[in-house]
């Protein structure tokens, strides 16, 4: 039997995180919710009924002069108007900032986003969000709200495919990594060392950690986000061994030195920490970047789409399969494969596995 870890986001759910506001001058400001600040937990933030603060990307930021913004409501929707959704800039940092949202009617913020927001489809699609994206840009098993991008390798998994996987004796498990807007950012620098990775929070249950620790079969990751989640676990374990507690995984931590701990020791340290503190799941974040030279410790097989040039995802593929990535991509280009979010998929085996 093999263990198949579903999409790293396997049960993360894309939220309609893009909101359009308007100043009294008529200027349009787009606000893209990234992660909750106050309250800091996703579930609590989505349950807020009057106000909450989020870290956001702010489009047309130079036009926002710190005044309160009113939601743009071109269709004069009465339900939307009754909410009275407003945005106030609390802190500015270039094109990002902390925004406080306030509204009436006692709706939870999750409902506010459903009624007022749009699904943030990838910018490289070069089109506006369509109603069908609400359904299609979501995995069948999406459950936990928090992502601003879908784990698109999982879009290929219909119920028939999932049933077929189970029928073949392949175990399916859930991890959850909330995909951030950084997944869209190309590598602009000639040196990847200058490319900043954004923090992405992830959750793995105690039971799953035990099963991964004891697993003796090939480990299959559906999606590059699953790879980042699973490979980050090793370094979270290292922090538990050396510092006594789990810490976020820094971008270049895997390359700082040769780590001698076994996977079993590393995951065992996380398990011991959770059990000692009465916790049933690990909640932490990662900025891990996977480039050629990375030592894979958990993932053997990868299901993934075809990615755009000059992206960190191409670097991950190169690290995973070695120089064969060029042959794979040449074949895809020569045979008319579709790339990116709504494109075709591939099954890749780690070099040396």
Go through each PLM region and give its residues.
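Surface-exposed, charge/polar-rich loops and edge strands
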Residues: 2, 6-353
């Amino acid at each position: 039997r093999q263990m198949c870890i579903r999409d790293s986001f396997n049960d993360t759910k894309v939220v309609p995180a893009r909101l359009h506001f308007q100043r009294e001058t008529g200027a349009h400001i787009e606000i893209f919710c990234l992660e909750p600040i106050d309250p800091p937990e996703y579930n609590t933030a989505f349950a807020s009924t009057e106000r909450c603060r989020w870290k956001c990307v702010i489009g047309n930021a130079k036009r926002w002069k710190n005044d309160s913004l009113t939601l743009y409501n071109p269709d004069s929707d009465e339900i939307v108007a009754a909410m009275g959704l407003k945005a106030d800039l609390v802190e500015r940092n270039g094109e990002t900032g902390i925004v406080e949202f306030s509204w009436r009617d006692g709706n939870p913020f999750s409902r506010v986003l459903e009624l007022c927001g749009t699904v943030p489809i990838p910018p490289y699609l070069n089109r506006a969000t369509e109603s069908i994206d609400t359904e299609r840009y979501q995995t069948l098993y999406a459950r936990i709200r928090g992502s601003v991008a879908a784990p698109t390798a999982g879009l290929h998994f219909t119920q028939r495919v999932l049933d077929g996987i189970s029928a073949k004796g392949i175990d399916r498990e859930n991890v959850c990594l909330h995909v951030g807007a950084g997944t869209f950012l190309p590598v602009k620098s000639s040196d990847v060392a200058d490319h900043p990775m954004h923090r992405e929070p992830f959750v793995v249950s105690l039971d799953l950690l035990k099963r991964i620790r004891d697993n003796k079969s090939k480990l299959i990751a559906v999606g590059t986000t699953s790879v980042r989640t699973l490979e980050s676990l090793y370094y979270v374990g290292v922090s538990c061994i050396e510092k006594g507690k789990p810490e976020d995984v820094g971008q270049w931590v895997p390359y700082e030195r040769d780590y001698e701990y076994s996977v079993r020791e590393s995951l065992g340290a996380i398990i011991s920490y959770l059990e000692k503190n009465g916790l049933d799941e690990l909640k932490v974040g990662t900025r891990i970047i996977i480039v050629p030279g990375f030592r894979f410790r958990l993932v053997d097989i990868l299901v993934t789409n075809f990615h755009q040039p000059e992206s960190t995802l191409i670097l991950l593929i190169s690290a995973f399969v070695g120089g064969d990535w060029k042959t794979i991509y040449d074949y895809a280009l020569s045979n008319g494969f579709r790339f990116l979010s709504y494109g075709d998929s591939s099954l890749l085996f780690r070099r040396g596995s």
